[in-house]
Amino acid sequence: HYRNVDRHDVMTDPHILSMRIDESLYFANAAYLEDTVFAQAALREDLAHVILMCPAVNAIDLSALEALEEINTRLRENDIALHLSEVKGPVMDALERSDFLNHLSGEIFLSHHHAVMALRTRETADPALI
């Protein structure tokens, strides 16, 4: 299980930032999402991956899609990949109708655990073996 690092004594990975989104994404919270992702990313010198965990996101509007595009672009400019996990069907449908997935620097994972395990494996892999 993945827990709030401010409330629980948990292990973290310096290369991975996991953020859980607890509501639908729309114009009223899109800028807050951007600001929060960038603020947290700035605190991690060795960051390579940001995973937005989306099990509570039931809907997404155009403003939020634009925010995700901006997050993806700015992270990519800093060699950080953006990934999504646990995306619900209707939200995935909206992402597929947009151009966002064509530019996503990372991947979409069915489960958050799978995302973390896959990305940790990549970060710890011996470059000589790849």
Predicted regions and their residues:
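Structured cytosolic domains appended to multi-pass membrane proteins
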Residues: 2-130
